[in-house]
A protein has these predicted regions:
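Iron-sulfur cluster-binding electron-transfer modules in prokaryotic oxidoreductases
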Residues: 1-137
């Protein structure tokens, strides 16, 4: 079984909790053992986007402490994954957290990226009858 750490962003936690539960179901169906740290909160993107970089950095430091480099970190949010992969460069480059940040950045995946490119899964027996939207972050 493939162990993964699950990051549920603050907006999903508060507004779309079913998405969190469905993410767990999907990862388990793909053969993952899901680890969920109940102390996690946010990636810091709302503060970062609003220009409050000191606050975003504090939240980001908590994020770096809440997750490990031992297992892939999987999130159902492309924008939060993008924040960690790209935005954290603005917050942590040339700091004492720089190396740890780089390790986390290499280890975080949006769920579809993880399933297709890491787990090599492309079919789950489901079919969508309707429209879908793709958000490239």
């Amino acid at each position: 079984m493939h162990k993964v750490e699950l990051f549920i962003p603050c907006f999903i936690d508060q507004l779309y909790p079913e998405t969190a539960f469905n993410t767990i179901k999907l990862l388990e169906k793909a053969g993952c053992d899901v680890i969920y740290n109940t102390e996690q909160t946010c990636c810091g993107q709302p503060a970062y986007n609003a220009g409050f970089w000191d606050d975003a950095k504090s939240i980001g430091q908590k994020f770096l402490n809440d997750f490990t480099e031992e297992h892939p970190i999987v999130s159902p949010s492309a924008s939060c994954t993008g924040m960690v992969r790209e935005g954290y460069d603005d917050l942590f480059t040339n700091t004492t957290d720089h190396n740890r940040c780089r390790g986390i950045q290499r280890n975080i995946f949006e769920i579809s990226d993880f399933l297709v490119n890491v787990m090599k899964k492309e079919y789950f027996g489901a079919e969508l009858v309707g429209r879908a939207v793709y958000h490239d972050s």
